[in-house]
């Protein structure tokens, strides 16, 4: 992955916040990261040391995020093989996504407010089809708590996409976040949310998807009448279009095949693909535009791109999330 001007701006920003604020509780940086050019591990100021990497997450969500990832056996994005602990990389988009969305995942009103601001026809968010509900006791009463945002969403990938596994966050098509919703007509809608932060991508052959993988798994699906991809394009062999295309196919296959999650099939008639990216990341914005230009007109209408600050703007004025917005403004938005 190449490094853009925006990447270096955000790296400098995170290093400054690490040194000058209490956001990371005054822990040092200089954690280890693999230098591909030098083929060795090196220390970097914007990488938290391993024992401090949990502090990359917003403090009120840390333990619950860890429990969530452990309960659903979700892999963390990391530079090494230890995929069971969050990365110390302050520029991680997985961490960026969790810091923005995890706090509100059990609040249907908050989740609906941010989704409806982007998709006006959505009138209701539904409990996650892949996360189990929880029970808590309040005033001696048993209360059911649902999750309305799933993270690292994957579902029946071996059947739907002919992939080897369905492990959330690793070795299969996953979506950073996912909302199951209902529109004004009572139809159920799949809302995958792909999250980008400082990413920019290279088109070198070493980053190209393998022909045999695409031919076996995705090319036929992309050519079916109901697919908005309108065939597998050459540009789809490279990220991020490779990600966007596979996520589109996963949603289309869920709609077409109605796979069961537990005892019940997941029913949906349509999808809305939300891609969250900072307004300042011009490279990823250009990539999204290219993807829109390559899909069918019906597919283009189903892609919504939004800046993370704009996405969470409906929460302004909500006292429940004042501390969250203050954190996000200090760390990412200002």
Which residues does each PLM region occupy?
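Charged, terminal alpha-helix-loop-beta segments
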Residues: 1-334
């Amino acid at each position: 992955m190449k490094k853009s001007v925006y990447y270096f701006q955000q790296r400098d920003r995170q290093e400054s916040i690490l040194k000058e604020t209490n956001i990371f509780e005054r822990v040092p940086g200089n954690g280890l990261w693999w230098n591909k050019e030098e083929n060795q591990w090196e220390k970097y100021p914007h990488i938290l040391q391993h024992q401090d990497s949990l502090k990359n997450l917003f403090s009120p969500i840390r333990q619950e995020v860890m429990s969530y990832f452990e309960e659903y056996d979700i892999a963390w994005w990391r530079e090494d093989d230890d995929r069971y602990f969050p990365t110390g990389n302050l520029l991680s988009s997985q961490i960026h996504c969790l810091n923005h969305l995890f706090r509100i995942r059990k609040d249907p009103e908050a989740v609906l407010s941010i989704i409806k601001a982007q998709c006006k026809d959505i009138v209701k968010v539904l409990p996650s089809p892949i996360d189990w509900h929880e029970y808590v006791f309040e005033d001696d009463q048993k209360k059911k708590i649902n999750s309305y945002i799933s993270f690292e969403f994957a579902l029946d990938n071996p059947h739907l996409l002919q992939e080897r596994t369905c492990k959330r966050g690793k070795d299969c098509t996953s979506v950073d976040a996912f909302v199951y919703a209902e529109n004004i007509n009572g139809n159920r809608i799949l809302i995958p949310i792909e999250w980008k932060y400082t990413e920019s991508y290279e088109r070198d052959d070493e980053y190209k998807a393998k022909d045999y993988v695409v031919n076996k798994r995705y090319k036929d699906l992309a050519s079916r009448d109901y697919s908005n991809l309108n065939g597998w394009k050459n540009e789809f062999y490279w990220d991020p279009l490779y990600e966007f295309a596979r996520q589109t196919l996963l949603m289309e296959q869920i709609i077409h095949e109605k796979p069961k999650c537990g005892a019940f099939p997941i029913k949906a008639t349509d999808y809305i693909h939300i891609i969250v990216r900072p307004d300042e990341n011009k490279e990823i914005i250009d990539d999204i535009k290219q993807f829109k230009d390559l899909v069918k007109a019906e597919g283009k209408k189903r892609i919504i791109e939004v800046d993370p600050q704009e996405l969470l703007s409906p929460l302004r004025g909500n006292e429940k999330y004042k501390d969250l917005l203050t954190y996000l403004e200090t760390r990412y938005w200002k």
